């Protein structure tokens, strides 16, 4: 069925782990007719969770993409993981979406990962609507949840639905736009519902919230403002138009509610997606740059009549078709069997098959156009973040930024015959997941895997076994420590070597200085007047790039410093890029102990939800882990949220300690916050361990 681009909705479903994202998606697929039975996460039958590990653990690891239809609109949905170790999946999904549905647990409200995901959506200016889920659960409180959206996320919630009843008495919702109650029929699994008059005991509250809705909506449009002044009301179509405008401009976020598991509130949520979230033509124009001239900006218009431009946002291996590259098409058309250009790599790629994905089921298609999200089979050189475009229209879209890993493990094959298979498996997995890094320890020869958390690496090792049949021995997780300097120093260094034949000569004067946390390594050359020929200067930068990886104190990479090449000298015969590389390394070694080197460790932001009676034990334990409690919040229901900063080194295996301390009733999540200096007594212990 041919649907115009104005009726496309490319959306993501995002939330904290266990807020009910995948269940909500399953209901959407059921009610839009994509599935004829409902899959449940706790049965391991959810169709969007298709990896074996997802079915076993009941969590979503990769972003599954699917397409469905609602009220003559085409809705492309990406279901994203809520576990903090898989934040990268959320990041790359948000990069290619036009709108999002943020799902909140009606009991817990705004949880740590909800904040992380919300910040990511802010970064890409993704308009969103909120769905307060699990309104049937004990302790569910819609109004507290709305308040948390305001206070914890700094958002402007605009209430569209009110719940009728709560916990086991949750029956349906009041739609403030139509001012009707919607009640679902249990026996039809929520497929049938009726519009009724609002219960008399809720009329005043409904009118109060509708007035707030009208006030906010009328400000979006002059015509609406005039109508509102004259009649103190707005017609439904104009009210929807105003809410849509405000949502797309980011002025407010509509808040809806329901219980996906109990089949209530999902159809109005779909209406909200269609009514309030943008189509590809409603969002800001995408701007790229000319690969040959980064100053030259190129606008990409969302029309199939324009040249083809797309972004590859995910690469994965499928056991039936091989490598799959997911792309979002921003303009133009793409036909299977055609040739496109990878602008970043300056290579052409042949398009083999083109697939429309439903979780891991696939449907072959021959053409896709602006607004579509499709998977391509057989691309050889394209990786996550690359731009694909017409061969005669070179353009680069903004690349995605991926976080640095904070934890590492050593892996080695159990048998020597598995060595080659291990290499193939890891190369495939690293190609799929930009937050996974692989390197080989020069001294031990061990393969080192770096990732975003224990669960992340655990699942990678599990996938090596299941998908590639590689059994590996895995070392204990290690913290990704870093080193930095605290003082500025200038070093004059001359590298001279004379042995029969051509010698080596290079002289450098380099200023080393500390930078703000998070700055990484910066290099600048201030050479003027040819003191060092310009073809030798990259040798200096390369030497520093290589030697900084070995650090100063205990062999960890040196970060957050700047090296400025101030002066130097060369020899007509004996100088070379290699000589200047060696001179730079010599200057670095001389700087090492003069610049006040310090060790840094990753600090995690930890949020713990615990029953009140275990508060004392939990806080005492946090203090014993060198943690600092930053905040405590009362959740009601005899529960508290504790927010703390704790060194990652002291958080391994924490879940088991927390469970035994709270008889399994407390839960926690954590994400990387920053690098901080390691106390001296810990440095002394680490020196013994690592040297």
From Swiss-Prot:
InterPro entries: EF-G-like_DII, EFG_II, EFG_III, EFG_III/V, EFG_IV, EFG_V, EFG_V-like, G_TR_CS
Similarity comment: Belongs to the TRAFAC class translation factor GTPase superfamily. Classic translation factor GTPase family. EF-G/EF-2 subfamily.
One GO MF term attached to the UniProt entry: GTPase activity
Keyword Hydrolase: no
Role, per record: Catalyzes the GTP-dependent ribosomal translocation step during translation elongation. During this step, the ribosome changes from the pre-translocational (PRE) to the post-translocational (POST) state as the newly formed A-site-bound peptidyl-tRNA and P-site-bound deacylated tRNA move to the P and E sites, respectively. Catalyzes the coordinated movement of the two tRNA molecules, the mRNA and conformational changes in the ribosome.
Transit peptide listed as a keyword: no
Subcellular location: Cytoplasm
NCBIfam families, per the entry: EF-G, PRK12740.1-5, small_GTP
Pfam family, one: EFG_III
Binding, GTP: 15-22, 79-83, 133-136
Highest taxon of source: Bacteria
Name of the protein in question: Elongation factor G
Keywords noted in UniProt: Cytoplasm, Elongation factor, GTP-binding, Nucleotide-binding, Protein biosynthesis
GO CC terms: cytoplasm
Record GO biological process: ribosome disassembly
Domain tr-type G: from-to ranges: 6-281
Main location: cytoplasm
SS bond partners: none
């Amino acid at each position: 069925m041919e649907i115009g681009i104005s009726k496309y909705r490319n959306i993501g479903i995002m939330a904290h782990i266990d807020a009910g994202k995948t269940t909500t998606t399953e209901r959407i697929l059921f009610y839009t007719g994509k599935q004829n039975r409902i899959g449940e996460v706790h049965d391991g039958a959810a169709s969007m969770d298709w990896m074996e590990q997802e079915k076993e653990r009941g969590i979503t690891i990769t972003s599954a993409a699917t397409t469905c239809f609602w009220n003559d609109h085409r809705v492309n949905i990406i279901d994203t993981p809520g576990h903090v170790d898989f934040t990268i999946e959320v990041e790359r999904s948000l990069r290619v979406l036009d709108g999002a549905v943020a799902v909140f647990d009606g009991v817990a409200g705004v949880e740590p990962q909800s904040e992380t995901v919300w910040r990511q959506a802010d970064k890409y200016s993704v308009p969103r609507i909120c769905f307060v889920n699990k309104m049937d659960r004990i302790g569910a409180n819609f109004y507290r949840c709305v308040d948390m959206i305001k206070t914890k996320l700094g958002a402007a919630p605009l209430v569209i639905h009110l719940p009728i009843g709560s916990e086991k008495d949750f029956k349906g919702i009041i739609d403030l736009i139509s001012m009707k109650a919607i009640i679902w029929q249990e026996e039809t699994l929520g497929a049938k519902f009726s519009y009724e008059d609002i219960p008399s005991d809720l009329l005043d509250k409904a009118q109060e919230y509708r007035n707030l809705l009208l006030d906010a909506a009328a400000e979006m449009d002059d015509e609406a403002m005039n109508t509102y002044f004259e009649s103190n009301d707005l017609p439904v179509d104009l009210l929807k138009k105003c809410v849509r405008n405000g949502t797309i401009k980011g002025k407010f976020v509509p808040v809806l509610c329901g219980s996906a598991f109990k089949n209530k509130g999902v159809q109005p949520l779909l209406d909200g997606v269609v009514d309030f979230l943008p189509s590809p033509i409603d969002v800001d124009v995408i701007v790229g740059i000319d690969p040959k001239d980064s100053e030259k900006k190129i606008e990409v218009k969302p029309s199939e009549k324009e040249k083809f431009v797309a972004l590859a946002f995910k690469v994965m291996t499928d056991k039936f078709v091989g490598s799959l590259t997911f792309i979002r098409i921003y303009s133009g058309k793409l036909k299977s069997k055609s040739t496109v250009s990878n602008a970043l790599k300056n290579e052409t790629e042949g398009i083999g098959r083109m697939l429309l994905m439903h979780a891991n089921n696939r449907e072959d298609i021959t053409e896709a156009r602006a607004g579509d999200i499709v998977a391509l089979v057989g691309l050889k050189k394209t990786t996550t973040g690359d731009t694909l475009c017409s061969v005669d229209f070179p353009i680069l879209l903004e690349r995605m930024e991926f976080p640095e890993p904070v934890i590492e493990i050593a892996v080695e094959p159990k048998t020597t015959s598995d060595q080659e298979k291990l290499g193939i498996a890891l190369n495939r997995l690293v190609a799929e997941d930009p937050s996974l890094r692989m390197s080989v320890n020069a001294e031990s020869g061990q393969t080192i895997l770096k990732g975003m958390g224990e669960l992340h690496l655990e699942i990678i090792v599990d996938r090596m076994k299941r998908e590639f049949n590689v059994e590996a021995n895995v070392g204990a997780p290690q913290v990704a420590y870093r080193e930095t300097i605290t003082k500025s120093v200038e070093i004059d260094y001359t590298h001279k070597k004379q042995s029969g034949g051509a010698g080596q000569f290079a002289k450098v004067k380099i200023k080393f200085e500390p930078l703000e946390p998070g700055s990484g390594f910066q290099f600048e050359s201030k050479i003027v007047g040819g003191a060092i020929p310009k073809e030798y200067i990259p040798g200096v930068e390369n030497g520093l790039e290589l030697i900084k990886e070995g650090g100063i104190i205990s062999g960890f990479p040196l970060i957050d410093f700047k090296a400025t090449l101030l002066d130097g000298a060369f020899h007509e015969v004996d100088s070379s890029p290699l000589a200047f590389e060696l001179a730079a390394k010599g200057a670095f070694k001389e700087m090492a102990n003069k610049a006040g080197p310090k060790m840094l460790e990753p600090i995690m932001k930890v949020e713990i939800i615990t029953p009140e009676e275990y508060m004392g034990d939990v806080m005492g334990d946090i203090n014993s882990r060198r943690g600092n409690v930053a905040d405590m919040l009362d959740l009601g229901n005899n529960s508290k949220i504790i927010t703390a900063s704790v060194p990652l080194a002291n958080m391994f295996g924490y879940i088991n300690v927390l469970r035994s301390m709270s008889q399994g009733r407390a839960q926690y999540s954590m994400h990387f916050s920053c690098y901080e200096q390691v106390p001296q007594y810990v440095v002394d212990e680490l020196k013994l361990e690592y040297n």
